[in-house]
Amino acid sequence: MASRLANVAIGVVLAITALSPAWAQGPGRGRGAEPPPPYRPAAGAKDLRSVLFNWTWYMGMLRGVDEHELVSSLEYQGKGTIQVDGQPCTLTKYRVSTSYQVSGQRVQYTCTRPNGRTVSNIEVVNGEYAWNEDIPGAELVAGKGNATPMPAAVQERLIRLWASPQGAPKAAIMAAAPSAELGANPGTLFKDGEMKAGETSLSWENGKPVITYPIPGVPGATATATLNEKYMAERVVVKQGAKTTEFIYGDYKDWNNPLNKIDALYAGKVTERHNGTVARDLTTDQTETGSVYVIMPVPASVRAAIHPAAPETLPKFELASAAPQGQTPRRADGHPDMTGNWNSAGMNWRYGNRRCDPTQQEGCSRALNQTMDFEFEAPSRFGPNRPEYKPEFWDKVQQLDEWTNKDDPVMTCQPLGNPRQGPPRRIVQSDKDIIFFYTQYADGGGGNNEYRIVPTDGRKHDPQKAIEATYYGYTVGNWEGDTLVLDSISFVDTTWLARGGFFHSDQMHVIEKLTRTGNGIKYEVTVDDPEVFVQPWVMTPKILTLNTNPEAGILAERADCEVYETKDISSQIRH
């Protein structure tokens, strides 16, 4: 799988939730009972609510028992012809990496003109910035590649993104409910009978639903999407002044890797016309839906050259958590007391057995859907915040993600390690040290009731102790005001930072900061790895809340761990 991050500063603070509803658990807890869907259109419904729901539902974009819209990215490969400088060019390579969460897309192509000349280019857009690259990730590392600012191309590239088979329903929903939570089910956002919400409207023409919505980030650009009988876009027309861009789509099916069929549909035929002239005529070879590492960091030279005109029109994916309440308890030494049981942050949806959608293949079952959807729902697989690897490592991350069932260390019972383990479930603090207790199922799976004992007396790293590499690193702690700072070095290089192939070297350096305010702890992590990162990765902060349940501190004994799969992998459905 592939996925690409952008350097756009978008914060996503994840809300706290339960992992599994009762009906998704074991015997005696309702196993086999079918949960009610969050929304089911009435028979014959022709309002905006039902059409937007069906559009995403039939496309396979709704995931999990609550049927959230969780398709965050797409890797696309195709063939055909494109227009280059007014001449047709036959493609020998055409790859598109799209991140819907950051309004970003990278198009890499190589083609041959009628005169035999080969043309190659890399066209990138990230929000309000557009540029061309001579190599992927040009200029991110000093002296490697050249990035050419292309301010005049921003609007054309954003139109292509937000008029695409998956981008169009996303843009229509965002325009209809701009304040909706990240990944909301469209059926829960509107009222029955509405034909217009926000800037999105619905009409019916020749028995087909027609959705009209604005293109994000492109002032004055209005898209009209005509859906077929299966609620998939067959034609999207974007008008902006005197320019008309038309997209024709057909042959929808699951084009994902045969080893990772996840019933997420995409168009097999794509035709793009500019004022009637064919600009791109493509046939799909393969897609990877929901790729975890799709990034397009903006080079400094591009930021300096382009001055955004209307960034406020771009989608912002943000979730806020409640502010901590109450007084902050302190120890006799004056430091905040971290002792207690804590609820860690996860996503705001539930795992479970999703009902089969209308276009799923024969043999679909709720149990299969639960396995299939996990790669969309796992906390560290969602959200736009990604480490910025050096470009030469991008393909390695994608390949590790493709074979995560074989390569993820957790599949062979290795500890999650730091920082993947995440925040502790229980903390015991003394004058000279602090003890962290962890539970299973950190990172939405894995972990095995580990613990750490960290000195907090302000000592420095001892070079002799730093010789030995461990899963959680050699950690020392000190207080900076009311913030406890943990400094960790000397890691093994066999753990991952998160799901999705986020590997690291043995030069990784991790700084954790814990700040207690009232009944909450703000948990912040910065990861530096000069061997593989362009710059330190500041992970999305998590807010821990005090759990006052007297049973919360009772942790199960360390469980047995079973190696889940052998090297003979018959499926790439990611965990």
Question: What are the language-model segments listed below?
Answer:
Residues 10-13, 98-100:
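Intrinsically disordered, low-complexity proline-rich regions
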Residues 225-227:
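Short conserved beta-strand segments at catalytic cores or DNA/RNA-binding microdomains
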Residues 25-205, 216-217, 221, 238-251, ...:
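PEST-like low-complexity, intrinsically disordered acidic/proline/serine-rich tracts
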Residues 1-12:
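Bacterial N-terminal signal peptides that target proteins for export
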Residues 19-24:
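Sec/Tat signal peptide C-region and signal peptidase I cleavage site
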